[in-house]
């Protein structure tokens, strides 16, 4: 029996050239964040199932990869309801909240964190969407003022700009304004999450599609009309603490990047409590990144409330866009030492070792005499900047 060689649906093999591009994107993002005072941490890919399943993770809860218990823990005859006690993380924010609660005594306040790692979601694969994909997150924990939002909204766009994207804008809203919009449309607060799921589809299905979706969920025509009318709300007409904060954020950030208020912006995570935002590009249908404030997520670990704000870059989308532009990472100096006769092996190794620590990439190749020409051409195609044929023990 021969096994299939293609990776599982929604995952991908990454070739060396693509890996070089991914490393470049990671390094650019990481270095930008470090310049703004953020430090990198790492959390496990596997978390306890109760953390993931009781998280207000929105639609992601339906796409959770669960890990079956093993050995004596998987006692099917005992009639256990839960066959899994672990799961793969579907974002980096939940693990960060657990990490902070576990290590807060050893961390500065506020804590400015960088996370770069894979996450998993059991969703239907499509172009630009994978079941395993990388996220690049930056979060500020312990600061309740809007300085956190402003710092993130001037840091993440800078990383995106350094990656070569210019035609983008920041859109911003606030979960408190969303709730106000729903409640003033005579819709019960218990339906807030349901209504937000419909509003979140407006870019895909349009206003009429949202109207139909809400009707199917049982909202009356009066409620739907009131909500649709408020979807055109002008920020200047709003007078609340949330509206004033959004205005101030826009006033500061707009000096550096284009920012606009979007009353229909939802973001999928139910744990957001305040400002929410996205970076949208005209070069890609969808966002290049997004995030928001989540001031209650850490409450499940401790009694005192800890405010927090985070922003996640759409790493895979950015990589796909750069690949579509045929972007090539600047080639490092690569030197190949080629020999035919085995007696030159030691000499080739010695020459290679002389370059250790000089920042040059070296490789050794033994080639058959009748294939030397073909091999040299192949090495040039692979990006070697210098090819040395070792055929003399004295030089």
Task: Please place each PLM-identified region on the residue numbering.
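Acidic, His- and aromatic-enriched active-site or binding-groove loops in soluble protein domains
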Residues: 60-78, 186-210
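Short secondary-structure capping/turn micro-motifs that flank functional sites
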Residues: 49-50, 176-177, 198, 371-372
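Short low-complexity, flexible loop/linker segments enriched in glycine and/or proline
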Residues: 55-59, 184-185, 275-277, 380-381
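Positively charged, Gly/Ser-enriched RNA/tRNA-binding surfaces
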Residues: 21-36, 47-48, 82-83, 91-105, ...
């Amino acid at each position: 029996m021969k096994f299939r060689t293609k990776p599982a649906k929604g995952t991908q093999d990454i070739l060396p050239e693509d890996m070089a591009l991914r490393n470049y994107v990671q390094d650019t993002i990481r270095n930008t964040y470090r310049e703004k005072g953020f430090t990198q941490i790492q959390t496990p890919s596997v978390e306890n199932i109760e953390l993931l399943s009781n998280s207000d993770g929105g639609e992601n809860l339906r796409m959770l990869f669960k890990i079956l218990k093993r050995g004596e823990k998987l006692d099917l005859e005992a009639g256990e309801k839960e066959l899994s006690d672990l799961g793969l993380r579907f974002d980096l924010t939940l693990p960060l909240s657990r990490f902070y609660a576990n290590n807060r005594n050893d961390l500065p306040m506020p804590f400015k964190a960088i996370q770069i790692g894979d996450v998993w979601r059991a969703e239907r694969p499509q172009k630009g969407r994978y079941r395993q994909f990388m996220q690049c997150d930056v979060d500020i924990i312990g600061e309740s003022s809007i300085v956190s939002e402003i710092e993130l909204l001037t840091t993440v766009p800078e990383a995106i700009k350094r990656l070569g994207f210019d035609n983008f804008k920041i859109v911003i809203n606030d979960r408190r304004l969303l709730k106000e919009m729903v409640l003033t449309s005579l819709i019960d607060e218990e339906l807030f999450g349901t209504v937000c799921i419909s509003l979140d589809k407006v870019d895909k299905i349009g206003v009429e599609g949202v109207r139909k979706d809400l009707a199917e969920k049982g909202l009356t025509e009066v409620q739907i009309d009131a909500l649709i009318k408020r979807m055109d709300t002008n920020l200047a007409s709003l007078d609340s603490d949330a509206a004033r904060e959004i205005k101030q954020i826009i006033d500061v950030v707009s000096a550096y990047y284009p920012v606009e208020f979007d009353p229909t912006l939802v973001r999928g995570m139910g744990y957001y409590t305040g400002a929410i935002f996205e970076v949208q590009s005209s070069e890609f249908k969808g966002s290049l990144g997004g995030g928001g404030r989540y001031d209650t997520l850490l409450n499940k670990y401790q009694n005192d409330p800890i405010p927090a704000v985070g922003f996640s870059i759409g790493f895979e989308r950015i990589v796909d866009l750069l690949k579509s532009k045929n972007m090539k990472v600047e080639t490092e100096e690569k030197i190949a030492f080629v020999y035919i006769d085995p007696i030159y092996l030691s000499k080739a190794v010695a020459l290679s070792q002389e370059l250790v620590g000089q920042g040059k990439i070296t490789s050794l190749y033994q080639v058959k005499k009748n294939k030397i020409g073909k091999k040299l051409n192949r090495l040039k195609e692979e990006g070697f900047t210098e090819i040395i044929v070792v055929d003399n023990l004295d030089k």
